[in-house]
From Swiss-Prot:
It holds the Pfam family KdpC. This is Potassium-transporting ATPase KdpC subunit. Signal peptide: none annotated. GO terms for molecular function: ATP binding; P-type potassium transmembrane transporter activity. The lineage of its organism: Bacteria, Pseudomonadati, Bacteroidota, Flavobacteriia, Flavobacteriales. The gene is kdpC. Keywords: ATP-binding, Cell inner membrane, Cell membrane, Ion transport, Membrane, Nucleotide-binding, Potassium, Potassium transport, Transmembrane, Transmembrane helix, Transport. InterPro entries: KdpC (IPR003820). Belongs to the KdpC family. One of its GO terms (cellular component) is plasma membrane. The system is composed of three essential subunits: KdpA, KdpB and KdpC. It is found in: Cell inner membrane. Part of the high-affinity ATP-driven potassium transport (or Kdp) system, which catalyzes the hydrolysis of ATP coupled with the electrogenic transport of potassium into the cytoplasm. This subunit acts as a catalytic chaperone that increases the ATP-binding affinity of the ATP-hydrolyzing subunit KdpB by the formation of a transient KdpB/KdpC/ATP ternary complex. It is a single-pass membrane protein.
């Protein structure tokens, strides 16, 4: 009987600690973060159009395209495809993405397409692409929008995020497309 009360006390203590105190502490700390821990929003005319850390689907020719998503950009079902690079289904899917990309960019050769433009990220929601992935789309976007390639290329170069310490440079696709809509 003594053991049962000890176990119940420990269980109650752990529930209070991890279900009440810890979440409240994290919530309190988040209040000091930008946007109070509610995510880094991107707004246009005071209307939230997306989040900086969650990718969105862009497949219109007048916008820059992001990375493909294994979960069709469903944030609730975030995840990769879990298929090996040697899986025939995966290879067929990547080939289909390459074919689609080449149809929209007939001036490119297959080997010029950066891997991030035809492979999904581990989360399936990556908001960023490589600068190379953005730069190879400049011609298509400029032609469709009837803008000079130089102007669109300058916009891309302005939106390249350099790594803080280590890593690679990236371009946030939503931020780039919002800035693109602001171009005249």
């Amino acid at each position: 009987m003594k053991n049962i009360f000890s176990i119940l006390k420990l269980t109650f203590l752990m529930v209070v600690l991890f279900a009440v105190i810890y979440p409240l502490a994290i919530y309190g700390i988040a209040q000091f973060a930008p946007n109070k821990g509610k995510g880094e929003t991107i707004s246009v005319n005071e209307k939230v159009v997306g989040y900086q850390k969650i990718g969105q689907k862009f497949d219109q020719s007048n916008y820059f395209w992001g990375r493909p998503s294994a979960v069709d950009y469903n944030a609730a079902g975030s995840g990769g495809s879990n298929k090996a690079a040697s899986n025939p289904d995966y290879l067929a899917l990547v080939q289909k993405r390459i074919d689609t990309f080449l149809i929209a960019h007939p001036y490119l050769k297959k080997l010029e397409i950066p891997a991030d433009m035809v492979t999904a990220s581990g989360s399936g929601l990556d908001p960023n692409i490589s600068p190379e992935g953005a730069l190879i789309q400049v011609k298509r976007v400029a032609e469709v929008r009837k803008l000079s390639e130089e102007k669109v290329k300058a916009l891309v170069e302005n939106k390249i995020n350099k790594p803080t310490l280590a890593g690679t440079s990236t371009v946030n696709v939503l931020e780039l497309n919002v800035a693109l809509d602001e171009l005249k």
